[in-house]
């Protein structure tokens, strides 16, 4: 017969053994929660793993029951981030990103000539969608340009309906008698506006003066304006120093003011000189005189080295100075050699 004490002791040990088979707090899984979450569980109690918002379960079981052994089964459940739709290409722009997974943020930029129509960044949400919506790169446009007073639009071709695209240009012209101050060409900028407009102003010039020993012709009208022209000429024996035609400039003055300079009489009876790179007889080439500004080179002798060299002489308003080294060759001194026939130094 079994002792009652032994039976009581055995029951106690059995109770202690069963009570000691509780399950511990379950392992933490990244990006997941456990319900209910306690420090220990009695055999038969159930727990459920759930992925946090923005994550989805991959493989493994979600529900577990605490076994009599007190050991939770190995959990192979994984919670992985939701993946938003591919957004790595932005037409006429660029996307900066690492991944398209929750909760990453991507940013956007547009090429020159385009602007972001939408936000410059978007975040992958818990639902696996981009927020805010993905932007687009739209072309920068400028409205039709304003036309300055006293100007006309000379060149303008809209390329976006009525508007112009970035770097498109427009060219202006001023009305007659008006001068342009500023650039005649404006450009559509990255800000969607045009560069600075030019200004057209009426410009008058005084009547040009007649030069001494010459004459001037200009339009027969009460006032001379921008771009009007005047022509000059000189009387016989004089030549024009400056342009034959001048123009009224945007500053209200003339582009030049020529004068009439006297011609020069040939200073010697006979000599071979260099004119514009060629040897010529001065008495033949300039039988009617040398014009103001004409330049010739006279031949001179170096007696010590027995060679020749040249020195220049120029007609300046009726005066020309012959180089002192030049010796005019007399036709009677036929035994002497002219300097132009001596070998150069």
Swiss-Prot record:
Residues 21-81, 82-139, 140-202, 203-262 form the Sushi domain. Residues 263-345 are annotated as: Sushi-like. Expressed by the liver and secreted in plasma. Glycans are attached at residues 33, 149, 162, 183, 193, 253. Coiled coil: none annotated. Pfam families: Sushi, Sushi_2. It comes from the Eukaryota. GO terms for molecular function: heparin binding; identical protein binding; lipoprotein lipase activator activity; phospholipid binding. Transmembrane segments: none annotated. Keywords: Disulfide bond, Glycoprotein, Heparin-binding, Repeat, Secreted, Signal, Sushi. GO terms for cellular component: cell surface; chylomicron; high-density lipoprotein particle; very-low-density lipoprotein particle. Residues 1-19 form the signal peptide. One of its GO terms (biological process) is blood coagulation, intrinsic pathway. PROSITE patterns: SUSHI (PS50923). Binds to various kinds of negatively charged substances such as heparin, phospholipids, and dextran sulfate. May prevent activation of the intrinsic blood coagulation cascade by binding to phospholipids on the surface of damaged cells. This is Beta-2-glycoprotein 1.
């Amino acid at each position: 017969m079994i002792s009652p004490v032994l039976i009581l002791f055995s029951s106690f040990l059995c109770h202690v053994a069963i009570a000691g088979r509780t399950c511990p707090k379950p392992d933490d899984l990244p990006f997941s929660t456990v319900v209910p979450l306690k420090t220990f569980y009695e055999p038969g109690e159930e727990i459920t793993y759930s992925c946090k918002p923005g994550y989805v379960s991959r493989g493994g079981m979600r529900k577990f029951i605490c076994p009599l052994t007190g050991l939770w089964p190995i959990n192979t459940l994984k919670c992985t981030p939701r993946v938003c739709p591919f957004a790595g290409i932005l037409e006429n722009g660029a996307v900066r990103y690492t991944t398209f997974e929750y909760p990453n943020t991507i940013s956007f930029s547009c090429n020159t000539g385009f602007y972001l129509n939408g936000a410059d960044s978007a975040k992958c949400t818990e639902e696996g969608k981009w927020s805010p919506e993905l932007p687009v790169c739209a072309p920068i446009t400028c409205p039709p340009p304003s036309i300055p007073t006293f100007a006309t639009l000379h060149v303008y071709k809209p390329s976006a309906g009525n508007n112009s695209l970035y770097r498109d240009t427009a060219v202006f012209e001023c009305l007659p008698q008006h001068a342009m101050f500023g650039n005649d060409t404006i450009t559509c900028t990255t800000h969607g506006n045009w560069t600075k407009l030019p200004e057209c102003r009426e410009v008058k010039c005084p009547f040009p003066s007649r030069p001494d020993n010459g004459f001037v012709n200009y339009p027969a009208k009460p006032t001379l304006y921008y771009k009007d022209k005047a022509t000059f000429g000189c009387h016989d024996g004089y030549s024009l120093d400056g342009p034959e035609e001048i123009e009224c400039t945007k500053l209200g003055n003339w582009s030049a003011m020529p004068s009439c300079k006297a011609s020069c009489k040939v200073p010697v009876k006979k000599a071979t000189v260099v004119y514009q790179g060629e040897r010529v007889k001065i008495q033949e080439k300039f039988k009617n005189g040398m014009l103001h500004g004409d330049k010739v080179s006279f031949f001179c002798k170096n007696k010590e080295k027995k060679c020749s060299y040249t020195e220049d002489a120029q007609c300046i308003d009726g005066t020309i100075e012959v180089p002192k080294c030049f010796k005019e060759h007399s036709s009677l001194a036929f035994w002497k050699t002219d300097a132009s026939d001596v070998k150069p130094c």
